[in-house]
C-alpha cells in the first residue's frame, strides 16, 4: 500500500491486511494462503505470521494456514526446473540460437535461505542440460557488504564478464 490512491484511479490498494480485516468483519476467519514465492522469504517467515498475530490480538478468531513456498528445500521442486527447461527450449526455437551460456537470475535477497532456492534450481538445471552448456547465476540487485556475498554477482557484472570472455556466443 505504498502507492498513493491517486495513482490507482483513486482507489487504495488492497493489502493482505486490509483484505483479511474485511473478511473478518464479514465473519470469515479461516484462510489458506498459497504463496507465489520460490523460497522462504521474510514475508513468509516473519511478516505474515506477525500480521496474523496482530490481527488475532485486535480481532481474535483468525485461523490462517500458510503452505510451503514453491520450491521447499532441501528437496526442491523438479517441476520448476522442468518449466525453466521448457522456456529454454522455446527461446532456442524462437531465436534459432543454440545457447552455450545461460544466466539464471533472481531478484536478490538479504536471506541466504531464499538465495539457496536459486542455487538449487541452477544445480538441477546443470544436471539436466547437455554437457557444455554453462549455467551462471546472478542477482538483479543486492545489498552492499560481505555478509551478502551469498547472492553472487550482479547480472550486469556477469553479462560484462561473459561478453569479455566471448562476445560472439549466445
Predicted regions, residues:
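Active-site-proximal alpha-helix that buttresses catalytic centers in soluble enzyme cores
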Residues: 1-170
